[in-house]
Amino acid sequence: MIHREKYHHLRIRLASPEQIRSWAERVLPNGEIVGQVTKPYTLHYKTHKPEKDGLFCERIFGPIKSGICACGKYQIIEKYSKFCEQCGVEFVESRVRRYRMGYIKLACPVTHVWYLKRLPSYIANLLAKPLKELESLVYCDLFLARPISKKPILLKLRGLFKYEDQSWREIFPRYFSSRGFEAFQNKEIATGGDAIKKQLSNLDLQGVLDYAYIEWKELVEQKSTGNEWEDRKIQRRKDLLVRRIKLAKQFLQTNIKPEWMVLSLLPVLPPELRPMIELGEGELITSDLNELYRRVIYRNNTLIDFLARSGSTPGGLVVCQIRLVQEAVDGLIDNGIRGQPMKDSHNRPYKSFSDVIEGKEGRFRENLLGKRVDYSGRSVIVVGPFLSLHQCGLPREMAIELFQAFVIRGLIGRHLAPNLRAAKSMIQNKEPIIWKILQEIMQGHPVLLNRAPTLHRLGIQAFQPILIKGRAIRLHPLVCGGFNADFDGDQMAVHIPLSLEAQAEARLLMFSHTNLLSPATGDPVSVPSQDMLLGLYILTIKNHQGIYGNKNHPYKQNNNKIFLNKTPYFSSYDDVIKAYNQKKVRLHSALWLWWGSKLRTITSINREKPIEVQYNSSGISFKIYEHYQLKKNKNEKNFSVYICTTVGRIIFNQQIEEAIQGTLKASLFRNQSLPAITI
């Protein structure tokens, strides 16, 4: 079992054969060592009990029922013994079958298909050989002829040669006899995973690193040849050298040996992670992993028999069986990676180990990263433009369920409910006092919103919850960038931070208005897009006619009366909004707005000529420009300025000013101490 106090992180790396053996092997009180799975059996067809030394063996993985051994004895009866001497099963809890592992001792080394076939191929990069050549070697289509010792021997072949070549059979017919071929193969040639393992074990990683760096440096200093094909060839060689340098450096830094990419011991998962379930009338359903494990054990045992009877087994048959073992292990680890997957009797591909752990429904994302936790909920998100940037709308039904413990404490603390049962009854009846207490609690308690997949830290942010009607979570449209969310049916999870540390972290680090910039690039994240940009464009669109809008229509008719159509004057934002609500002006109608005594915009006022100039008897002048008016006294000083604008632009400018003032107030509020909420 993994305890949180003992383990703080998880590291995934290559395991040595000794480490794999240490995971599975255990010494029983009688001195017997168990852990190796040698039989391809699962459950007995009559008793439905695990077979000894099989894939569900109770001696290896632990008892099916806590305190009961395979022969039916109880721990209470055998209270002075920790295991049953008759069947060898320990008296422990059955949950050990969730983490106790076994192993299969392979009769020949098997190349791990992840490091061979996955791109980039680590084995091909480390050995600096083509992937097709290595594949032919792994699956016994080619043989590696290379002397192990440096002593002179009769036959020394260099490189690779094809097994199907008939000239080989004609030249060396005696070596293809049973014993001659075996002796020749053990000394001079290798194929399958054994050939890969020998090459990897003979690698000097520091030498590979040094020579690759020297060659890469020479290629970098080399000038272009002018031939496009040669330049591409040199670039591919440089890319290969860079990959070799990185790979060799990582192996040296982590103290991992390259030959560990070839398996000699195959781990067997705990039986609870690959269960076999009994249905009605004795019918059994099993995990696909069990069938794949059985195929590996069957073929491995056959190879063991061939090697044990080497005197009567043809060498070609042994080579074919080595290939079958390699393909069986490939199907267990990653079925279908080489093309045609292994299928069952219903022509359905088996679900391999890679299929179990990868993807959205894999072990990591489904069971480890996607656990269900208390004080959390999930619902569809919809747009909430009326919210502030740091707010989110929680449905009443969800909020009362999430904050139920806090509401109960508030009811009992205020003596509104005598006990827990009465408080729950009030919540179920949805009495009005419940919502008042809930609002008070939510004012001082942030919530965390998370949208899967959480690819960076902006995938989970804190918000101030607001009670709303309906069943969907309301979200401000500007925070969708960090979540990569849109309102086409996306769902988000709500979490309640319980501890004071979690609440402090949510307030200081995770609030949405404190995460406006991308932590990776520094670019703004909360930027308007899509319908927001379209709405802002329509709101602030300019009336192209401007002050000339009444030139073609100087009069207007209302209630059979004709009035002079003049551009209206307003002294404040409120007057404009009031006139717009009373439908006296339109959204894009041009109007004059009083702008104080100073022109707060950068303009070419000294070069622009007025359209019209008016003087009165007291010496006050009116200069009318295309976008503004200046009212000056005798000394030519401005004491009144009007600007030409529209209702939409005034609404937009008013919202911007209120947002800036709200930010200033919020910053002043953060510097003050927060009042305590008594419940």
Curated annotation (Swiss-Prot):
Transmembrane segments: none annotated. One of its GO terms (cellular component) is DNA-directed RNA polymerase complex. Zn(2+) binds at C69, C71, C84, C87. It catalyses: RNA(n) + a ribonucleoside 5'-triphosphate = RNA(n+1) + diphosphate. It is an enzyme of class 2 (transferase). Keywords: Chloroplast, DNA-directed RNA polymerase, Magnesium, Metal-binding, Nucleotidyltransferase, Plastid, Transcription, Transferase, Zinc. Its main location: plastid. Its EC number is 2.7.7.6. It is found in: Plastid, Chloroplast. GO terms for molecular function: DNA binding; DNA-directed RNA polymerase activity; magnesium ion binding; zinc ion binding. The keyword Plastid applies. Gene3D superfamilies: 1.10.40.90, 2.40.40.20, RNA polymerase II, clamp domain, RNA polymerase Rpb1, domain 3. GO terms for biological process: DNA-templated transcription. Mg(2+) binds at D486, D488, D490. SUPFAM superfamilies: beta and beta-prime subunits of DNA dependent RNA-polymerase (SSF64484). Its cofactor is Mg(2+); Zn(2+). InterPro entries: DNA-dir_RpoC_beta_prime, RNA_pol_asu, RNA_pol_N, RNA_pol_Rpb1_1, RNA_pol_Rpb1_3, RNA_pol_Rpb1_3_sf, RNA_pol_Rpb1_clamp_domain, RNApol_RpoC1. Binds 1 Mg(2+) ion per subunit. Binds 1 Zn(2+) ion per subunit. Signal peptide: none annotated. It holds the Pfam family RNA_pol_Rpb1_3. SMART domains: RPOLA_N (SM00663). In plastids the minimal PEP RNA polymerase catalytic core is composed of four subunits: alpha, beta, beta', and beta''. When a (nuclear-encoded) sigma factor is associated with the core the holoenzyme is formed, which can initiate transcription. Belongs to the RNA polymerase beta' chain family. RpoC1 subfamily. DNA-dependent RNA polymerase catalyzes the transcription of DNA into RNA using the four ribonucleoside triphosphates as substrates. This is DNA-directed RNA polymerase subunit beta'. The lineage of its organism: Eukaryota, Viridiplantae, Streptophyta, Embryophyta, Bryophyta. The gene is rpoC1.
